[in-house]
């Protein structure tokens, strides 16, 4: 049986890296909110026709309209889509959970998740490698990681 473990480490980003992370947080939030808005519109349009199969856009659709989305990790944007899908499924499964809400810039807790593909997320002694970031991020590794890194949430 495969066992997944979560490790929590503190990172010490430089000023340039902080700007990159805040840009990524903003782009993930934007894509999530745009996709939620599109889903609400599609649901309103198809309300009268239950047989109509609704096709939802992917984050790639928004990259044509918003060029700055190309500067951040595409897997972070894809994970925003997966989070929205999960929120929708949870809502339709159990109405008491509540309808998915738009993400706010004012929320002090902001994060994004990226997946490891061929070593794009890796830890070298005291340094963390993150996709689309040119430099390594300083990290405090206080215990040994066993196994393979599947994803990282920043």
Across the structure, where does each feature detected by a protein language model lie?
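Nucleic-acid substrate recognition interfaces
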Residues: 1-154
